[in-house]
């Protein structure tokens, strides 16, 4: 089940993925919206075994800029979606995962969150974004410990500079220095490289409570 806010984008993605996929429209910050999405997923696929939290936004603004103090609403919105939205989805999904028939090692589900290297190496103007992603990193281990009794693993991926729609909106003047900062290879990460790590996390049943920089 692909969860999106934009219906047109969701339809295009499902069409490209082919059979065995569906989409639901939901706002990750809204409890009722996420609950409805989870119900739709269970009705369509019979249960929830894997959740990958990818919803996120960025907002570049210095703490004090030429127009004054950082707009507080920008900060709140980024934290609301990136951090609180992630927690909202995983907490509600975990309830349903707990109803699954345990598999190998008693596992009932896997949750993969998305942070960012900005959680560790935030740049100028990234206070809100870095704080939100650091929050995702910080809650990974405690939540993994919380959900261990239910047979649910929780891990987080902290991607570097990836070829995403958010990055596509940036100018070459912004993108080029970021690419130059990477060690090797000096290019943007690819979506399939992120997906490959998600697949490994799901398949490696001994991996839990960890944040992996990619």
Enumerate the predicted regions with their spans.
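Residue(s) in the substrate-gating loop at a strand-loop-helix junction
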Residues: 116
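Alpha-helical segment proximal to the catalytic Tyr-Lys
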Residues: 95, 145-146
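C-terminal substrate-recognition "lid" of short-chain dehydrogenase/reductases
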Residues: 190-214
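Conserved mid-core segment of classical short-chain dehydrogenase/reductases
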Residues: 35, 58-76, 95, 99-105, ...
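Catalytic Tyr-X3-Lys loop
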Residues: 57, 68-88, 112, 136
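The beta1-alpha1 cofactor-binding region of Rossmann-like NAD(H)/NADP(H)-dependent oxidoreductases
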Residues: 7-8, 25-37, 72
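Active-site helix of classical SDR
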Residues: 90, 132, 140
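Conserved glycine-rich Rossmann-like NAD(P)H-binding loop of the short-chain dehydrogenase/reductase
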Residues: 1-12
